[in-house]
């Protein structure tokens, strides 16, 4: 009996060590978080430096959109870097926290956000609130984000999580500038504010991702939000033409939004249906008929075609005019006289 008790105590001790073992940087994906402080960023160089994800400061409800938000989002996405956004909080009431969440949603809607939307709660305002008041802010923000179809996460520094954010149940992004993070089970860890990355002038925050969100935020396949559709491959946004089975799709070259309707890619004009798949043959568009080559998908111009029993004259703009009846109405040509052979 004593031996069994001793064994159980040893097992419990080992388990406790494992549970609270500091998180090492080499165990996860490495990324950065950036804002206007970094100025203009060369995202191609950032990608070449091995950065695997980026959190972009959206700004705050109080001060508005970060001056470099759109440039950073477009630059990161164009270089195949998965992105998330974070909002700096000044809220002191749940109503203000809800407005901060709505602000985050409003700036995220035009981009394929591949990471949780982060609530940065660390301001001096929050140090004046009780733990319960801060948790209420977090819950309001995160619930609003979740209700809009996004995944939330809470960012703060280790001591604030241990001080005035106790009881927060949401995923956590913990700032602790040390060789390891000893806060239990962080989803992300901000390990330094003095990192150096190619493409960025000066210091930048270095982050590590530990939680796999692929079961929550799909890493592969079509993703639709706010009426826009993207195609992701391991969180990287596909751009340009994509063939899936017997269907072809076109995603615009910068942000990778799936295109519908008429599309010009520099080589020709194509037509994509409501599902984004390329359509061919004779198609009615806004009351006019156009013909798209079944082999290439490109729109034909300045030619004549026969579809079934009908003949169409196609002008330089691609508009097809049915000339079948017109041709039938033409008088028959007189028979040519037969010239006897000499």
Question: Where are the model-predicted features located?
Answer:
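Sec-dependent N-terminal signal peptides of Gram-positive bacterial secreted proteins and lipoproteins
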Residues: 2-26
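Hydrophobic anchor at the start of a short beta-strand
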Residues: 83, 151-153, 172
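Aromatic-lined carbohydrate-recognition surfaces of secreted/lumenal glycan-active proteins
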Residues: 148-162
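Extracellular adhesion/carbohydrate-binding repeat motifs centered on closely spaced tryptophans
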Residues: 217-342
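A mature extracytoplasmic/lumenal domain signature
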Residues: 36-38, 60, 87-89, 123, ...
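Substrate-binding cleft of extracellular glycoside hydrolase catalytic domains
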Residues: 28-142, 146-149
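Glycine-rich, charge-decorated loop segments at or immediately adjacent to ligand/cofactor-binding or catalytic sites
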Residues: 96, 160-168
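Functionally critical loop-and-helix segments that line ligand-binding/catalytic clefts
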Residues: 28-38, 44, 48, 167-219
């Amino acid at each position: 009996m004593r031996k069994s008790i001793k064994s159980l105590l040893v097992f419990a001790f080992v388990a406790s060590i494992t549970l609270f073992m500091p998180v090492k940087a080499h165990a996860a994906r490495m990324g950065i978080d950036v804002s206007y402080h970094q100025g203009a960023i060369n995202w191609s160089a950032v990608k070449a430096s091995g950065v695997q994800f980026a959190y972009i400061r959206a700004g705050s409800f109080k001060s508005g959109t970060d001056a470099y938000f759109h440039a950073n989002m477009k630059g990161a996405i164009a270089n195949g870097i998965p992105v998330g956004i974070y909002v700096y909080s000044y809220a002191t009431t749940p109503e203000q926290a809800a407005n901060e969440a709505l602000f985050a949603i409003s700036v995220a809607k035009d981009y394929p956000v591949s990471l949780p939307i982060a609530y940065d709660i660390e301001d001096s305002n929050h140090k004046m609130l009780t733990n319960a008041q801060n948790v209420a802010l977090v819950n309001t923000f995160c619930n609003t984000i979740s209700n809009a179809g996004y995944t939330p996460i809470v960012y703060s520094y280790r001591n604030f999580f241990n001080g005035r954010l106790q009881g927060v149940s949401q995923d956590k992004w913990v700032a602790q500038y040390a060789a390891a993070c000893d806060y239990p089970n962080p989803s992300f860890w901000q390990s330094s504010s003095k990192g150096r990355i190619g493409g960025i002038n000066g210091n930048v925050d270095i982050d590590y991702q530990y939680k796999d969100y692929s079961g929550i935020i799909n890493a592969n396949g079509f993703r639709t939000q706010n009426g826009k559709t993207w195609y992701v491959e391991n969180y990287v946004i596909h751009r340009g033409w994509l063939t899936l089975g017997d269907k072809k799709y076109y995603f615009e070259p910068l942000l990778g939004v799936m295109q519908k309707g008429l599309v010009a890619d520099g080589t020709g004009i194509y037509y994509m249906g409501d599902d984004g798949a390329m359509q061919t043959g004779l198609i009615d568009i806004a009351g006019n008929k156009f013909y798209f080559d079944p082999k290439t998908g490109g729109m034909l111009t300045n030619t004549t075609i026969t579809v079934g029993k009908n003949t169409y004259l196609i002008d330089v703009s691609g508009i097809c005019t049915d000339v079948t009846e017109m041709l039938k109405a033409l008088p028959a040509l007189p028979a040519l006289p037969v010239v006897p052979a000499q």
